[in-house]
Design a protein with these regions (language model features):
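Flexible glycine/proline-rich, aromatic-decorated loop/lid segments
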Residues: 34-41, 201-209, 249-277, 323-326
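Active-site metal-binding loops of divalent metal-dependent hydrolases
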Residues: 22, 163, 279
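Conserved N-terminal subdomain of the carbohydrate kinase-like
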Residues: 13-16, 24-157, 318-328
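Structural motif
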Residues: 17-19, 127, 156-159, 188, ...
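Conserved post-catalytic alpha-helical subdomain immediately downstream of the catalytic base
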Residues: 239, 265-325
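Extended, hydrophobic alpha-helical segments in both membrane/secreted and soluble proteins
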Residues: 159, 176, 187-189, 193-197, ...
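Conserved phosphate/ATP/ADP-binding segment of small-molecule kinases
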Residues: 165-259
Length: 328
């Protein structure tokens, strides 16, 4: 454990580019008042509204709180959520000059309505998503590429955080992967729906559900996991694939054929898995850019994700929390 504690100090100050679908995660808390006369629904009196970085913006935030110097690249609308996200990321010390404004589309938002009463436990009753399904306009893509051309020479690692909302176009993807390969810097993709299009990336992170969707079959045994993880590794031609498996920990597949299974760091007090994958990616890329080998990078990521799941909602993990966890 002492080795990991020493290793994580190499993560500090690493310059990381995070590009992807920036999301405003909104938590709207309300107190149950009465039944509406208009329809058989509850009337909630809004108590507060909390907005936190979600999607790729959560990767940005976690990379920053874990000690990285982060350059955020993505597309926001011209609305209150864009303004709030920019402000939040600035408070983390993030470089936000790579965020492009597209007035034709809203900032992606996921509004969770949470209802409760004085004698009841608060719980989420509905989620309202708002995003454009239209492809990025050519002029917006051109602006993104110009931002990348300016930022890439400054960074040591690249994260592609693809939530399926179209920020990482084919041209953007090619630019990033070619740059990473040419300059021999680590790149990692976490793609919710289409990881197969990222062939040539350095590293791949998926959860077990995403892996099952990619291979088109259930992963119901260790044999199925090994077969599926190896298939993803082969088809993406990555250096390694990291699969997060919930309460079963993580599995790292390396090009050498080695497979490492890492148990969860702490099975107690799992409150919420929201955003834990983003924390995992943030820790992994920081470790890789700190010249930490992939297996130890995965172990560090496992500790970081273990801290994240013990927090309610989308959240960040600090370097101090990670250091304390690896010291235990």
């Amino acid at each position: 454990m002492q080795k990991l504690t020493t290793s994580i100090r190499k993560m500090q100050g690493r310059k990381i580019l995070v590009i992807g679908d920036m999301v405003a995660d909104v938590y709207l808390n309300g107190q149950i008042g009465r039944i509406s006369r208009e329809a058989p629904v509850l009337i909630l009196q809004q108590v507060d509204e909390k907005i936190v970085p979600g999607g790729a913006a959560n990767v940005v935030a976690n990379t920053a709180t874990l000690g990285g110097e982060v350059f955020a690249v993505g597309v926001l609308g011209d609305d209150k959520y864009a303004e709030k996200l920019r402000g939040l990321l600035e408070t983390y010390g993030v470089h936000i000059e790579g965020l492009v404004t597209d007035e034709s589309r809203p900032t992606i938002s996921k509004v969770r309505v949470i209802a409760g009463g004085r004698a009841t436990v608060s719980q989420q009753v509905v989620r309202i998503d708002n995003e454009s399904k239209e492809p990025l306009a050519k002029k917006i893509e051109t602006q993104l590429i110009a931002k990348l051309d300016a930022i890439l020479p400054q960074v040591e690692g690249i994260v592609l955080s693809d939530y399926g909302s179209g920020t990482i176009t084919e041209n953007v993807k090619k630019l990033l992967l070619n740059y990473a390969q040419k300059n021999k810097i680590p790149s990692i993709v976490d793609s919710r729906y289409d990881v197969g299009r990222f062939g040539g990336v350095g590293y791949v992170k998926q959860n077990d559900t995403e892996l099952a969707a990619f291979v088109g079959r259930d992963i119901d045994s260790m044999g199925a996991l090994i077969e599926s993880g190896s298939e993803l590794l082969r088809k993406t031609n990555a250096s390694a694939v990291l699969i997060t498996r919930g309460e079963n920990g993580m599995s790292l597949f390396e090009r050498s054929g080695a497979v490492h299974h890492i148990p969860v760091s702490d099975k107690s007090e799992v409150f919420d898995v929201s955003g834990a994958g983003d924390t995992c990616v943030a820790a992994f890329i920081l470790a890789l850019t700190g010249k930490i080998n992939p297996i130890n990078a995965a172990r560090i990521s496992n500790y970081a994700a273990g801290i994240a799941v013990r927090k309610l909602g989308t959240s960040t993990v600090s370097f101090e929390e990670l250091e304390n966890a690896t010291n235990k």
